[in-house]
Amino acid sequence: MPNASTPILIVDDEEIVLLAIAESLIPEGYRIVRTTSPFDALEILKREEFAVIISDHHMPGMTGLEFFSQAQHIQPRASRILITGVLTLKVVVDAINKGEIFRFIAKPWIREELLATVKNAIHRFELVSKNAILEEQTRETNSSLRQTCDELAKQNAILTKQLSEREMTFE
């Protein structure tokens, strides 16, 4: 569930868009970090974990897809939402293949759609994070079980040898 500690990064070269998105999300209790530069955003991602990253597609110096492609390597669990005024088939295909975009939002967006998309993106982030924890616990449990199995196999070999030796003494 969203709360004050749910961090969202917003990247758009237009301050007015950053402000509009933030004004929609802040009343819902999200903690917003915003920047007009995708390059600055990449540096921010190296310092702080985000549940959701929202980015414009058309920005000077780097497209939203290029940004998401790099952001994915820094924070693979974060849900990525692309906001764009022009949605072409090429953008959609590239977004899926290169940036693993969670959702698209068209400009101008509908506030309720934005809020629902962000809520779903946070839910996805939480599931992916829990899954990563469960995978690590499974690896640790499997390692422990392998170690126990190896120890039991050694003890079994010792007991089998002792049993064979006793059977020989009775013959």
Please describe what each predicted stretch is:
Residues 1-9:
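Non-catalytic signal-transmission and effector/linker regions of two-component phosphorelay proteins
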Residues 6, 15-33:
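Two-component/phosphorelay signaling modules centered on CheY-like receiver
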Residues 6, 36-37, 63-66:
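Acidic catalytic/metal-coordinating carboxylates
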Residues 34-52:
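Acidic, metal-coordinating helix/loop segments flanking the phosphotransfer/catalytic sites
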Residues 56, 84:
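Active-site residues of response regulator receiver
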Residues 59:
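Receiver (REC) domain active-site loop signature in two-component systems and cognate sites
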Residues 87-91, 109-118, 122, 126:
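C-terminal output helix
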Residues 126-171:
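Amphipathic alpha-helical coiled-coil "transmission" helices that mediate dimerization
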